[in-house]
Structure formats: C-alpha cells, structure tokens
C-alpha cells in the first residue's frame, strides 16, 4: 500500500510539476556524467593533454611540423630578423648524432604559405631557430621571429627563456639529409597532466557526481513521501 501511494505521488508530481521533474532529470544526467568522467580520470593516469594549451599554437606547430629543418653546412652567425620574437619549449627529436651531449642550434627561414597561411601573411617570412639542449637538459627551445600577424596571438603554453636571442651560433650539419623535426612526435605540442593533477581532478568530479545523484535520490524520496495533491484538485474532479 505504501509503495502504491509513493508511486501515485510521483505520478501526480510528474503531471503537475513538469519544471521540477525536468530540473531533477538534468541534475541526474549531470551526476551520471560526473561519475563517468571522474572514473575515467582516475583510471587513465597518463596521456591526457592539458586543456590550458591554446589551440592556435597547436595548429601552427602542426603545420610547421610537416616541414624539414636543414642544418647549415658550416658554423655561421644568424641574426634574428623581425619585430616580434616568441620562444617556446618543446620536446623534439634531432637524432642521436655524435654531438648529442652538446647544446646545438639550427636555423631555417620559412614562408607563411609553407605553414598554411593565406592572404597577405602567405608571403611573410619567419625565421625559426631551434636550440637543442644537451642530454642532461631535456627539451628544445624554438624561437620564431617575424611580424606579429604571422605568429599566433595568444601566449605560448610553455615559454622558453630568450637568453642569447640576439645572435645564434649555428651548429654544423648532422648528416647528409635534412632533419624531420617532428618525425617521431605524435603530438606536435602537448603538456600532459600529471598523475597528481588527474587524481585531484578525478576525485573532485567523482565527488560532485555522487552529490548530484544523491540529491536527485533525495528529491525523489521526498516527493514520494511528502507530495500530496491539493484538496481543490479532488473537488474539481468531483464536480466534473
């Protein structure tokens, strides 16, 4: 009898308070989504990209990653040209040459059309300098020098120190062929979330999901026990 009355109360609430029912369903869906996302974050502790990386830099470097960087045949001094210089730190693979334990610098000039730019930006030149750190210091600093309209307007996700930007001593050639900068990189630019960040984010999302699901259950139980139709509702049905 009690279960029938509770079901009847829920049916009356559904019939006479649709906005409340819709709000409860929305909270329930959000809670279930939070449970699923939180569980995913807690079980996948590696390989997730940081959402704070600007997508325009990702697209720019993916286009740049289709090119080959050709080292100079002899040691020369390169001058940074262009009113705007941006430096960012990436993880690149330049091969295991005999000088892999030394900091090396490679330089190339590219046109906007080579990285997918159109219009007036297609003919603009960009001077790219890569400073490959020694094995003890992982990471490669990439410096882009050119007019501001060619480079992405947002700040680079991982800035690189501009120490020694004025002049760059270029290293000798590392073999007979040009070097494919991103030949071994699946993602051109990515900053992975650490396991601590994933655990913190996953636990908070999971807790929020549990809270929303419990809130929906509490609303349903309260409605089933406490909701009663107004007396005038029965009188109106009797008159009809």
UniProtKB/Swiss-Prot annotation:
<keyword id="KW-1133">Transmembrane helix</keyword>
<keyword id="KW-0732">Signal</keyword>
<keyword id="KW-0472">Membrane</keyword>
<dbReference type="InterPro" id="IPR039493">
    <property type="entry name" value="TMEM248/TMEM219"/>
</dbReference>
<keyword id="KW-0325">Glycoprotein</keyword>
<comment type="function">
    <text>Cell death receptor specific for IGFBP3, may mediate caspase-8-dependent apoptosis upon ligand binding.</text>
</comment>
<protein>
    <recommendedName>
        <fullName>Insulin-like growth factor-binding protein 3 receptor</fullName>
    </recommendedName>
</protein>
<keyword id="KW-0675">Receptor</keyword>
<dbReference type="GO" id="GO:0005886">
    <property type="term" value="C:plasma membrane"/>
</dbReference>
<feature type="topological domain" description="Cytoplasmic">
    <location>
        <begin position="226"/>
        <end position="240"/>
    </location>
</feature>
<keyword id="KW-0053">Apoptosis</keyword>
<feature type="signal peptide">
    <location>
        <begin position="1"/>
        <end position="38"/>
    </location>
</feature>
<feature type="glycosylation site" description="N-linked (GlcNAc...) asparagine">
    <location>
        <position position="167"/>
    </location>
</feature>
<keyword id="KW-1003">Cell membrane</keyword>
<comment type="subunit">
    <text>Interacts with IGFBP3. Interacts with CASP8.</text>
</comment>
<keyword id="KW-0812">Transmembrane</keyword>
<dbReference type="InterPro" id="IPR039587">
    <property type="entry name" value="TMEM248/TMEM219_dom"/>
</dbReference>
<dbReference type="GO" id="GO:0006915">
    <property type="term" value="P:apoptotic process"/>
</dbReference>
<dbReference type="Pfam" id="PF14940">
    <property type="entry name" value="TMEM219"/>
</dbReference>
<feature type="topological domain" description="Extracellular">
    <location>
        <begin position="39"/>
        <end position="204"/>
    </location>
</feature>
<feature type="transmembrane region" description="Helical">
    <location>
        <begin position="205"/>
        <end position="225"/>
    </location>
</feature>
């Amino acid at each position: 009898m009690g279960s029938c009355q509770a079901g009847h109360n829920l049916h009356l609430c559904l019939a006479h308070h649709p906005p409340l029912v819709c709000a409860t369903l929305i909270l329930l869906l959000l809670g279930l989504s939070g449970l699923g996302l939180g569980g995913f974050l807690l079980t996948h502790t590696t390989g997730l990209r940081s959402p704070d990386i600007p997508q325009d830099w990702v697209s720019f470097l993916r286009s740049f990653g289709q090119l080959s960087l050709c080292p100079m045949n002899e040691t020369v001094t390169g001058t940074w040209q262009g009113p705007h210089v941006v430096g960012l730190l990436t993880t690149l693979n330049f091969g295991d040459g005999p000088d892999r334990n030394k900091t090396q610098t490679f330089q190339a000039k590219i046109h906007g059309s080579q990285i997918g730019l159109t219009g007036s930006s297609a003919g603009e030149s960009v001077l790219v300098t890569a400073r490959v750190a020694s094995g003890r210091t992982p990471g490669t600093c990439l410096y882009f020098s050119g007019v501001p309209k060619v480079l992405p307007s947002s700040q680079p996700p991982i800035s690189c120190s501009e120490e020694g930007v004025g002049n760059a001593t270029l290293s000798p050639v590392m073999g007979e062929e040009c070097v494919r900068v991103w030949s071994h990189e699946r993602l051109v630019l990515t900053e992975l979330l650490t396991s601590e960040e994933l655990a913190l984010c996953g636990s908070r999302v999971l807790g929020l999901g549990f809270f929303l699901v419990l809130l929906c259950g509490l609303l349903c139980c309260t409605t089933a026990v406490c909701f009663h139709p107004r007396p005038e509702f029965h009188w109106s049905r009797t008159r009809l």
